[in-house]
């Protein structure tokens, strides 16, 4: 079974970009990761791959509303990136909206996540900010590790305060979530927000280059422009997953390192590409991509 990482937070905090960067870090050793976004209000397939025309048959909606969900059905809807062949994605197709499919059901979502977890090493669940979308609370419940991304401002603070009462049940493991400050900028009162929110585990500093990647259909190239604070947050997620593995299977060769604490300001310049850990280790030549249905990708 794969490790399930759920990412949630307030609107515009950088969740989807974080998921893309995390997938590249986790697949640096040729492990396989699957990013799943079930937010029908913003179909992600054309955002991840704007140059490709994917029919609605590739949509995650066909899986979540299927009569019977099994790993074969899930595998058929996974789109594998040619430039990063160890990363697969699932989401809604261009033109789809919340009324394109019947309302999502808890049992179907749990079954879907369970079947998807049999296919790859890591499942990354990129959640909607709307808790009325059943996928988000269900994904938090199913997670081995949950990442909470909050913008360090009044929007993020009040979003967190509004949604915390909805996640008080022990099954959501609210106190065990990692909390990152998303799109942190120089003018943000990080220390004050850290105190009000209850403590940040890491920072995801804003950078124009990262934003440009997100708005130009190059989300999987943004890792090269993340500074050390952002990289340390990604490392922390990987290390927490390794710690969980170590608890399950005691291994004397476990290579777990504490994240580095850098003295530089959070708005420093991006780390050079050569210094980036795993930034483009998986890149392949060529710009054109095509769809694969599990050939050499799944377990």
Predicted segments with their positions:
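Inter-motif core of Ras-like GTPase G domains
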Residues: 134-153
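NTP-binding/hydrolysis catalytic cores, primarily Walker-type P-loop NTPases
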Residues: 216-299
């Amino acid at each position: 079974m794969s490790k399930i990482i759920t990412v949630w937070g307030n609107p515009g905090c950088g969740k989807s970009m974080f998921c893309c960067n995390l997938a590249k870090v986790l697949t640096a050793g040729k492990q396989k990761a699957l990013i799943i976004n079930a937010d029908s209000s913003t179909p992600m397939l054309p955002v991840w791959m704007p140059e490709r025309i994917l029919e609605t048959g590739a949509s995650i909606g066909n899986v979540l509303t299927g009569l019977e969900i099994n790993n074969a059905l899930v595998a058929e809807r996974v789109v594998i990136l040619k430039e990063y062949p160890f990363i697969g994605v699932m989401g809604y197709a261009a033109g789809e909206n919340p009324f394109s499919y019947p309302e999502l059901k808890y049992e179907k979502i749990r079954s879907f996540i369970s079947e998807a977890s049999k296919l790859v090493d890591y499942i990354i669940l990129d959640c909607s900010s709307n808790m009325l979308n059943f996928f988000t609370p269900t994904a938090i419940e199913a997670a081995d590790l949950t990442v909470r991304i909050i913008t360090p401002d009044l929007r993020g603070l009040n979003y967190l305060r509004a949604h915390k009462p909805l996640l008080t049940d022990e099954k959501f493991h609210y106190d065990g979530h990692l909390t990152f400050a998303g799109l942190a900028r120089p003018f943000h009162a990080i220390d004050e927000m850290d105190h009000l929110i209850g403590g940040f585990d890491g920072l995801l500093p804003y950078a124009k280059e990262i934003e440009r990647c997100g708005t130009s259909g190059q989300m999987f190239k943004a890792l090269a422009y993340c500074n050390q604070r952002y990289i340390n947050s990604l490392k922390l997620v990987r290390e927490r997953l390794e710690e969980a593995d170590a608890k399950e299977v005691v291994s004397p060769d476990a290579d777990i390192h504490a994240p580095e604490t850098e003295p530089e300001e959070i708005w420093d310049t991006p780390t050079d590409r050569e210094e980036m850990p795993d930034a483009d280790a998986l890149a392949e030549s060529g710009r054109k991509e095509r769809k694969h249905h599990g050939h050499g990708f799944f377990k």
